[in-house]
Regions:
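Residue-level signal for short hydrophobic patches within transmembrane helices
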Residues: 12-31, 35, 58-65, 141, ...
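Transmembrane helical elements of multi-pass membrane transporters/channels
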Residues: 17-36, 138, 149, 172, ...
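Transmembrane alpha-helix boundary and packing residues in multipass membrane permease domains
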Residues: 22, 26, 38, 75, ...
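Small-residue-rich hydrophobic transmembrane alpha-helices
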Residues: 49-109, 146-165, 258, 278-342, ...
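Helix-terminus/linker motif at the lipid-water interface of multi-pass membrane proteins
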Residues: 31-50, 119-126, 182-189, 251-282, ...
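Short runs within selected transmembrane alpha-helices of multi-pass transporters and secretion channels
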Residues: 70, 139-157, 165-173, 194-207, ...
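Short alpha-helical transmembrane segments in multi-pass integral membrane proteins
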Residues: 1-19, 77-142, 186-241, 304-370, ...
Length: 458
C-alpha cells in the first residue's frame, strides 16, 4: 500500500475533496467574464455585451496557455510522485512556474501590439469595435496574472491542497464582483470600469497563488528547480497540449462563429449585432457548465495520474466512471434550465428588443440541445492526459471543435443560413461523445488486462 492517500483513500472521498474545490475555482474563472457581462449589459446595453463577446477570445487564449503549462506540469508532478521521483517532480513544477511567467509577458505584448487587427479578426462590427477595444486594452493587462494564477492552481491541487487553490480564485472573483457595480455605475466608467474590476481581482488572486510557493509539501524546491530546462519544458508542454489544444480550438470556433453570425445575421431580420450579442451570452452561460466539467476533470487528474503511475488500474477506472456520473447529473440540470427557462437566463444580461430575445432563446435551445453528453469528451481527454498518453488526449480534445464543429459551422450555413451555425453545436457534441466512449472503452479494457497480468505475476 502506498503512503500517499491518493493510492488508498476511498475514490468517492478523494473526488469530493479534490473535485469540489476545483469546480469552485473553475467556476470562478468563468464568473469573471459573466459578472462583467451582466453589469456591462445592464449599464451599457447589448452593444456592450457584444463588445465583451468579441474580446472573449483573448481570455480563451489566455486559458489555453495556462492549461498548457499548468496541466502539463501538474500531470508531470502527479506521475513523478506516483513513481517516487520527488526531484523530477520539483523540477517539473519549477520549470512550469517559470514558463507561466514568460508566456504571460509575451502574450501581453503581442495582444497590445496587434489589438485592433485582432479585434477585427474576431468579428467586431463598426458599432461594436470602439467598446471592444476599450475593454480589451485594459483586460490584457491582467492576462499575465491570470496565466500564473490558473497555472499555479493546478500545481497546488497536485500538491494536495485543492481548497487553497479554490480560495485564490474565489477572493479575486469577490473583489471583481464588488468593484464592478462601483466602477460601472457609481464612478460612471462604463465598460472600462468592468475591465478594471476584472484586472484588480486577477491581481489579488495572483498574489495569493504566488504565496503558495513557500508552502508546497510534496514538492521540495531547490534553486535548480527553477532553471529552465528545454527537455523538461517540452515534456510539460506535451502533457498539457491536449487540454490546451481544446481551448485553442474553442478560440478558433469563437472567431468563426462570430464572423459567421455577423455575415449571415446581416442577411436576416436580426441584423449583424443581435446574433453577436446573443451568441456570447449563450456561450458564457454554457461556460458555467463547462467550468464544472473542467473542475471535475481537474479534480480527477491527480487521482488518475497517481494511481496509473502506481499501477492501481482498478482505481483509475473507478475514478473516471465516477467523474462521468457527476457530469451526467450536472448536464441533466443544465438541459432542463436551457430548454425550459432560456428567457429568464438571458434577461440577466440586460434588456433588449423583441428580436434580440427571440434570437437568443432560439440560439440557447438549439445550440445547447446536446448538453447532456458534451462533457464526456472533456473528461475523456483529461483522462488520457493524466495517464501520460498526451497525444491521444490531444487528438480527443480536438475532436469536437476541430474535426466536427469547425467544418459544420462552415458548411451547414451554406444550406440552412444562420440556423446552420446553431445546428452545428448539437451535431458536433453527439459525434464527439460517441468517439470518446469508443476510445476510453478500449483503454479501460487494456488496463483491465494489465491489472489481471499484474495480479497473476505476483
Amino acid at each position: 500500500m502506498t503512503e500517499n492517500p491518493l493510492g488508498y483513500e476511498k475514490i468517492s472521498k478523494l473526488l469530493k475533496n479534490f473535485a469540489v474545490p476545483s469546480i469552485v475555482a473553475s467556476l470562478v474563472g468563468s464568473i469573471y467574464n459573466i459578472v462583467d457581462q451582466i453589469f456591462i449589459g445592464q449599464g451599457v446595453g447589448y452593444l456592450g455585451n457584444a463588445a465583451t463577446n468579441v474580446a472573449y477570445p483573448f481570455s480563451t487564449i489566455c486559458l489555453a496557455i495556462a492549461l498548457l503549462v499548468g496541466i502539463g506540469s501538474a500531470s508531470r508532478v502527479s506521475l513523478c510522485l506516483g513513481r517516487k521521483e520527488p526531484k523530477v517532480a520539483a523540477k517539473a513544477a519549477g520549470n512550469g512556474i517559470v514558463l507561466m511567467g514568460i508566456f504571460g509577458i509575451i502574450y501581453l505584448l503581442v495582444g497590445e501590439t496587434f489589438l485592433s487587427l485582432l479585434l477585427k479578426a474576431f468579428g467586431a462590427t463598426t458599432d461594436v469595435f470602439p467598446y471592444a477595444k476599450q475593454y480589451a486594452r485594459i483586460t490584457l493587462i491582467g492576462m499575465p496574472f491570470l496565466i500564473v494564477t490558473n497555472g499555479m492552481s493546478n500545481l497546488i491541487r497536485a500538491d494536495g491542497k485543492p481548497k487553497y487553490s479554490m480560495v485564490c480564485m474565489v477572493v479575486g472573483a469577490i473583489i471583481n464582483t464588488i468593484l464592478d457595480p462601483i466602477f460601472i455605475f457609481v464612478c460612471d466608467w462604463g465598460i472600462a470600469g468592468g475591465a478594471w474590476a476584472t484586472v484588480i481581482g486577477q491581481i489579488f488572486s495572483f498574489i495569493l497563488a504566488l504565496r503558495y510557493l513557500w508552502r508546497f509539501q510534496t514538492i521540495h524546491f531547490e534553486k535548480e528547480s527553477f532553471l529552465l530546462d528545454i527537455k523538461e519544458s517540452m515534456k510539460i508542454c506535451s502533457m498539457g497540449i491536449s487540454s490546451s489544444s481544446n481551448q485553442i480550438a474553442v478560440t478558433v470556433i469563437q472567431i468563426i462563429q462570430y464572423n459567421s453570425l455577423t455575415y449571415y445575421g446581416a442577411l436576416t431580420k436580426y441584423g449583424a449585432d443581435i446574433p453577436l450579442a446573443a451568441c456570447g451570452i449563450v456561450m458564457k452561460t454554457n461556460a458555467i457548465i463547462l467550468a464544472i466539467v473542467v473542475g471535475i476533470s481537474q479534480g480527477t487528474q491527480p487521482i488518475i495520474g497517481f494511481n496509473y503511475g502506481a499501477r492501481q488500474y482498478h482505481r483509475v477506472r473507478e475514478a473516471y466512471l465516477l467523474a462521468v456520473k457527476w457530469n451526467l447529473v450536472v448536464s441533466t440540470i443544465a438541459f432542463i434550465a436551457f430548454q425550459f427557462f432560456p428567457q429568464s437566463i438571458i434577461s440577466l444580461f440586460g434588456n433588449g428588443d423583441e428580436l434580440y430575445f427571440e434570437f437568443a432563446v432560439l440560439f440557447m435551445r438549439t445550440y445547447l440541445f446536446m448538453v447532456l453528453v458534451n462533457g464526456v469528451q472533456l473528461l475523456s481527454s483529461s483522462f488520457f492526459t493524466a495517464i501520460g498518453k498526451s497525444l491521444r488526449g490531444a487528438l480527443l480534445a480536438l475532436t469536437r471543435q476541430t474535426f466536427f464543429l469547425i467544418p459544420l459551422t462552415l458548411l451547414l450555413p451554406l444550406r440552412f443560413g444562420i440556423m446552420g451555425v446553431l445546428l452545428a453545436g448539437p451535431v458536433a457534441d453527439f459525434s464527439a461523445f460517441v468517439l470518446s466512449v469508443v476510445l476510453v472503452g478500449i483503454e479501460l479494457k487494456k488496463q483491465k488486462k494489465l491489472a489481471y497480468n499484474l495480479s497473476h505475476s505476483i
